[in-house]
Amino acid sequence: MTLREMIDRLLGRQQASATTAKHRLQLVLAHDRSDLNPDLMEQMRREILEVVNRYVELDLEGGDVSLETEERATALVANLPIRRVRDDVLPQVPAVQ
């Protein structure tokens, strides 16, 4: 997310339809280039949330894990609003396969 997008979001401004379409196209291209199927992407998202949630309490409604592409690089981006830092780290839960 760019600084301009973050400011627009904080001020409640709506994105132009061209900007929204561009972002969606970038997301589709990132998924295509990464060669990750949707099930694997969902599994990664769940595991990332589980690990981060051991250390901090998350606002899962406002969170997002996605692939983003800028120029020729694809990045896995996690935008996870933190409610509070946990006093004690939660124990690791064995992954269900």
Swiss-Prot record:
Keywords for this protein: Cell cycle, Cell division
Biological process annotations from GO: cell division; regulation of division septum assembly
Domain of life, per lineage: Bacteria
Disulfide bonding pattern of the chain: none
InterPro entries assigned to the protein according to its UniProt record, in alphabetical order: MinE, MinE_sf
Functional summary from the UniProt entry: Prevents the cell division inhibition by proteins MinC and MinD at internal division sites while permitting inhibition at polar sites. This ensures cell division at the proper site by restricting the formation of a division septum at the midpoint of the long axis of the cell.
NCBIfam families given in the database record: minE, PRK00296.1
Family (UniProt): Belongs to the MinE family.
Protein name (Swiss-Prot/TrEMBL): Cell division topological specificity factor
